Structure formats: C-alpha cells, structure tokens
C-alpha cells in the first residue's frame, strides 16, 4: 500500500508564511504612497481594475504596474491562452471563510490567489476603443446622480454641484473636453455629498484622486495628484479605508458612464440599421 507522504503541518506553515509575506507587501505598498510615483502607479492600476479592493490593487501595482488584464493559470488555459514559461505570478488576496471571535465580532480568513497578466501570455494585446469626445461628454452628463440644469455663464465656469439644491449646473457652449473634465469633477462631489455617511479626512484630496482615475480611464488630461498632509498623517489601515471610499466612488462613476455609453452605442447602431 502506497504511503501518503503529505505533511499537513508543513503545508499549513507554508501557506501561513505566504499570507504573511503578502500582508507585509500590502503594508509596505501603503506606506510608499507618500511617494508621488508610487501613488500614480497605484491609481493607474486601481482605475484599470476598479472592482479590486485597495489592498489587491496595491499588490498588483507593486508586482506588475503595467498589468492590463489578469486571470489565473486555469482561466487563461480555458480561453486557449498559454502562460509563458518562467512567468512570475502576481499574488493577491482572496476572501476565505468567515469566523466569529470570542467577543462576538466576525473575522475573515484570506487565501492567496496567483494571477498572470495578459503580457505574460501568448494572447494578443488590444486596447479598447475610446469614445469620441462628444459621445463621452453626453454620456458623462447623462450619468449624473442628481438633476442637471444648463446655465449661461461667462468666463471659464464649466460645472458645479449645488449641495443645497442637489443639482448639477452645467455651462452652455463649452467644448466636449471641458465638459468631460468639469462635469466629472462635479459628479464626484455630488456622489461624495449624497453617498458618503462619514466625512473623509480630506474631501478635496479624495476628489482629486477620484477625478485623476476617471480622467485616466477616459483619456482626459489632468494634473497628477499627491496625497495631502492629512492623508499622509493617517496610519496604513486608515489610509486604505480612505482610498477604498475613493475607489467605490470612482467605480460607481465609471459604471454609470459605461451604462450611458452603451445606450448611446445602441442608439447609434439602431440609426445605422434603419438607413
């Protein structure tokens, strides 16, 4: 009879050490966000993978800042894609089972999941088509979570959120690019006002981080942000909490814009079909 040489204790110790290594990587990556270059790498990854938690986006940015499309080995294989020999996997955290502590609070275990970027495979890399500026501007304005009112305004005013009226005021006769950036900034403020129950440590800085990710997603120019002094003063866990709020706001904005873009594409397709 074949003897089972599997050492459960050694396996558990190996998995524990791996988790500790990944948790340490998250802490180190968080602390490095005071470096503007590291912050921009993180924000770039977070906007590409807007549904990833902050911790997992930090992990991806630390291990593969150029990542654009991630999947585990089995998923790539199911798609008929081969991972290149010698490719180094990217470790992220995957929620495991929940459990109850003695004080009644609920904890959750984590497993390590190993991913590979499309650049580590034999799959062709393609960039998604960007909408034209006019279509993007229409989608952004239509994605507002509050009512929109067009106004005549001189000067360089583009858009502003009025918290008292729960209304977005948008200037007429602006270029599509002006509308895209200006309205996105106002929408972020509207979502912060209507969706957040607890005020962030630095609302203006959070808005700038969210707007930078949105501008990156849609190919719009914007000055690169940095963490504010108040954000830098937060401990690592609290800072990730702030960034998680920013991530949720940004992801919500993206989902709303993508929904409107899909409607506009469908309407345009219908117009072409009728011709």
Regions found by a protein language model. Name each.
Residues 1-275:
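N-terminal accessory/interface modules of nucleic-acid-binding and processing proteins
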